[in-house]
Design a protein with these regions (language model features):
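P-loop NTPase motor domains
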Residues: 1-215
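Conserved ATP-driven motor cores of ASCE-family P-loop NTPases powering translocation/secretion/packaging/pilus
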Residues: 26, 209-210, 214-286
Length: 286
C-alpha cells in the first residue's frame, strides 16, 4: 500500500487540530496563540461537530480557509451612519478583533494547498474515504499482511503520516466489539527513525508521534493491537516503549552502547551471553 501523490490519498481531515497547525503549518502554539485560537474555531465550524479533534471527520479545507479569510476581513457596524461625503447614508464600521491578524496563517495554508508535493493531502475525498483507507491498509480477514510504502511522502510530513496512520489503526480497533476484533500487529521497521529516545531534543511532531506509539505500547494489548519494534540501533529507541516489550529477539550486535542497553533488560547472570552476540552468524539470535 503506497501513500502519496503516486499512491493513496491521505486527506488533511485525517489530521488532528494539533497535527494541522503544529506539523503541517509549523506553527508554535505558545508564540501564535491568536492564530491557533482562530484556526481552532474555524476547524470545528468546518467539521460541524464538537467531537474530539483526534476523531477524523470529513470537512472541506477550502471552507476552513474561507472562514479564516472572513474573520481576517471582518468589519463590524457601529450602528451609526455617515452624514456627509461619498459614504453618506452608509453604516460606519470598525475592524473586527482578528481583522488583519490572520494574513500570515492564511498564506501558510494556501501555500501548502498550492504545493504539488502535498497534493495527496488536499485532493477532496468524502467521508466514506476513511473506511476505504483502513480496508486497504488492513486488508481483509485474518492473516493479511500489508507493507505501507511512505517513500512518496514529503520528509517534513513523514512523522505525522506515520503517527496518524498508527492512531487511525488503533482507534479502528477501539470501535470493534470483542467478538469482532482481529488481532493487529504493527511492525515498526528501522524504528529508531521515528520512535527515538531523544528526550528534550525532540521536535513537537516527533513528540506527538511518540505519544501515539507509547499509548499503543501501554494500552494496545487490551484491544488486540501489538507492536513489533525492529531496529539495528536499540540504544536509540524510546525507553518507555522498550519497557513495554514483553519479548526481545537479539541478533548480532557489535556496538558496545547497544549491547549495554540490551544487557539492562536481560535477567542477571546473562552477561556472558551478551559478550558473544558480536560473534553471531546470520540467522543466530538470542
Amino acid at each position: 500500500v503506497k501513500i502519496g501523490n503516486d499512491g493513496m490519498n491521505f486527506p488533511v481531515w485525517f489530521l488532528s487540530l494539533k497535527d494541522l497547525y503544529g506539523n503541517l503549518l509549523k506553527i508554535k502554539e505558545d508564540s501564535a496563540q491568536v492564530q491557533v485560537a482562530a484556526l481552532r474555531d474555524a476547524f470545528y465550524k468546518a467539521r460541524r461537530s464538537d467531537a474530539s479533534e483526534e476523531i477524523p471527520l470529513s470537512y472541506d479545507i477550502r471552507e476552513l480557509c474561507s472562514l479564516l479569510e472572513a474573520e481576517n476581513a471582518l468589519e463590524i457596524e457601529t450602528g451609526e451612519y455617515y452624514k456627509t461625503g461619498d459614504k453618506t447614508g452608509m453604516p460606519k464600521t470598525v475592524k473586527g478583533e482578528l481583522n488583519g491578524k490572520l494574513t500570515s496563517l492564511i498564506q501558510l495554508l494556501q501555500d501548502k494547498m498550492r504545493d504539488s508535493r502535498y497534493k495527496f493531502m488536499f485532493s477532496p475525498k468524502g467521508e466514506n474515504y476513511l473506511t476505504f483507507f483502513l480496508e486497504k491498509v488492513l486488508g481483509t480477514g485474518a492473516g493479511s499482511v500489508k507493507v505501507i510504502d511512505l517513500s512518496s511522502v514529503p520528509n517534513d510530513m513523514l512523522p505525522t503520516v506515520v503517527a496518524v496512520t498508527a492512531r487511525l489503526l488503533y482507534r479502528g480497533q477501539l470501535t470493534q466489539t470483542k467478538e469482532n476484533v482481529i488481532p493487529l500487529t504493527i511492525v515498526c521497521d528501522e524504528a529508531h527513525n521515528y520512535i527515538p529516545a531523544g528526550g528534550i531534543n525532540l521536535t513537537a511532531s516527533q513528540r506527538r508521534l511518540l505519544d501515539v506509539f507509547e499509548t499503543i505500547a501501554k494500552e494496545g494489548r487490551k484491544f488486540g493491537v501489538s507492536l513489533l519494534v525492529v531496529s539495528q540501533r536499540p540504544s536509540e529507541l524510546n525507553r518507555t516503549i522498550l519497557a513495554q516489550c514483553a519479548n526481545h529477539i537479539v541478533l548480532k550486535l557489535s556496538n558496545d552502547i547497544d549491547k549495554q542497553m540490551i544487557q539492562g533488560i536481560l535477567p542477571e547472570g546473562s552477561k556472558g551471553i551478551m559478550d558473544s552476540v558480536n560473534l553471531f552468524r546470520p540467522g543466530d539470535c538470542l
